[in-house]
Amino acid sequence: MFEPVELSNNAVIKVVGVGGGGGNAVEHMVRERIEGVEFFAINTDAQALRKVEVGQTIQIGNNITKGLGAGANPEIGRTSAEEDKELLKSALDGSDMVFIAAGMGGGTGTGAAPVVAEIAKELGILTVAVVTKPFNFEGKKRMMVADQGVLELSKHVDSLITIPNDKLLKVLSRGISLLDAFGAANNVLKGAVQGIAELITRPGLMNVDFADVRTVMVEMGYAMMGTGISSGENRAEEAAEIAISSPLLEDIDLSGARGVLVNITAGFDLKLDEFETVGNTIRSFASDNATVVIGTSLDPDMNDTLRVTVVATGIGMEKYSDVNQTKNKSSKEILMDYRYQYLNISPTAIDKKNVKNEIKETDNKKRKEPEYLDIPAFLRKRSD
């Protein structure tokens, strides 16, 4: 049996959109009225910030960019965030949990998001990042810049969810409009934030507090997220199976997850046996050593509908450990790596192996890059 725990809804949760894509995703969440969280948009582009309808906006790097954006250069994004580090620290201070949303491959999102994450971690905040990777047609240069951004970000977050934009093409109809496609993408990010936040902020039959969430997500590395919705007689089993078998999650082995966080959202008609069904379905793929936390959120508007949100953390921990060994590098070494990756990748088609060899010859060092896991949450409308 799964035992209920006491509710604690005093946790301060902030959602920070970094760059154009992150700002658009956060604006979508504001419109959807996710409860119990504060929203921020951070950008180098003053015009973009004026257009976004978010609770609080923070312009960074004005002395560097003059409010004109990072120009798809992550170095400008990084230095802009460093310039206004105290301003960012003030915005994040007092948080218990911070979600960072960004698009990798552009300027502000790629360069500034790791700085924001580093500040949050220095403040002792539980830090979760949800980022996108570019479509293949955007070119190898942008993809490699995105990979480097993910690598930098992974050093400063507790859990990292990456979303490959190309997987979006497999779950949407070919005739869908561009606007609807990006709306669907933002819904995935919303689902990740909402599913976790509502466990803490919204009352349910089986409540979960912030300490439970922290246990599952702190220092866990790569993570995945899936959502399933169903109605009718077998809604519990169907929703749980959809959540763990989304096409967005293909080729991902969930059995190695060290932590699993589950939120069941339903109306007042939620039955105990449905709670058990979801729990048993989730445990069928989780390892015996995984920490599994299952809670519920009651939504009176969900008549006959049940939603299951699953966040599996600690996936591919060996790869994540290899990545975090780079923490021992000096900041100068990391900066030189980052600049080389961005400035020396030709915009034409280049074999990634050749680029890695060039980097190796420059440093006289071998570098290991993790095989990034394709895991869900939101899709970028803009990456810088």
Curated annotation (Swiss-Prot):
Keywords: Cell cycle, Cell division, Cytoplasm, GTP-binding, Nucleotide-binding, Septation. GTP binds at G20, G21, G22, G23, N24, G107, T108, G109, E138, R142, N186. GO terms for cellular component: cell division site; cytoplasm. Transmembrane segments: none annotated. Coiled coil: none annotated. SMART domains: Tubulin, Tubulin_C. Disulfide bonds: none annotated. GO terms for molecular function: GTP binding; GTPase activity. Its main location: cytoplasm. GO terms for biological process: division septum assembly; FtsZ-dependent cytokinesis; protein polymerization. It is found in: Cytoplasm. SUPFAM superfamilies: Tubulin C-terminal domain-like, Tubulin nucleotide-binding domain-like. The keyword Transmembrane does not apply. Belongs to the FtsZ family. Homodimer. Polymerizes to form a dynamic ring structure in a strictly GTP-dependent manner. Interacts directly with several other division proteins. Essential cell division protein that forms a contractile ring structure (Z ring) at the future cell division site. The regulation of the ring assembly controls the timing and the location of cell division. One of the functions of the FtsZ ring is to recruit other cell division proteins to the septum to produce a new cell wall between the dividing cells. Binds GTP and shows GTPase activity. This is Cell division protein FtsZ. It comes from Buchnera aphidicola subsp. Schizaphis graminum (strain Sg).
